[in-house]
Amino acid sequence: MKKLLRGKKACDPASHLWLKKKNGTMTRGAVKIGEGQYGKVYRGCIDDGCEKYIVYKEIKTPSLSEKTNNLPLAGFKKALEEMNPKMEFTIAKKLEGFGVPKMYLYKTCDKKDILYSEYVKGKELREWMRFQPTLLAMKSVMLQVIYNLYRIQKKYPGFRHHDLHLGNILVRPVPVKDIKFMGHTISNAGFEAVIIDFGFSAFPRIKNPLINANNYKNIGISR
């Protein structure tokens, strides 16, 4: 991993990652798995055996017109102008071990930034629920989210996610094991809950213009 992300290589991931074709053969490259207003998300393998995946997001630098288009609130416009995607990476990096994806690297390149992170092979909670999981599995997933938020609060009392909904919780299959929580034990039922998307989060000593300036109150988000 360190060799892959070293130096200029990190600015051209598609030339160094591996992609498995439908016929099973391997080639250099990555596949796009998502796209937002300011960036595209890709997945690739770090070895030619495709035993481990990595995800990276290429973030273009938006122009002023792109940032402020259809945004009538002056304060919200200013916040978007100041917002740095690296802030979200930094928050997630500090929360490693608390049920969030592992962050690998934030690389500033020519005309774009690239964020490398762990690939979470799972489904959004709202989609996972459509497959009618068992009552034990549903209880376990909810407990995992609550437990990890509790653990985060113990270490970082000032943390607030501010945007924790069914689309920002991923559920992935894992080996069955027991979870101990405040004197109680419950099975994970073969699933792990992963909290994502910290773009609206508040974190001690990390400035988030969307939250620190109270602009979230104007866009339907409350503490």
Task: Tell where the protein language model's regions lie, with residue ranges.
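Activation-loop N-terminal segment of eukaryotic-like protein kinases
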Residues: V171-K177, M182, N188
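C-lobe/activation-segment region of protein kinase-like
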Residues: H184-R223
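ATP-binding glycine-rich phosphate-binding loop
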Residues: L5-D48
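ATP-binding glycine-rich loop module of kinase domains
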Residues: A30, Y38-K94
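Conserved structural core of kinase catalytic domains
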Residues: K67, A79-E82, M87-F89, K93, ...
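Activation segment
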Residues: T61, G122, R172, V176-K177, ...
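Conserved kinase catalytic-core helix
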Residues: Q132-H162, L166-G167, R172
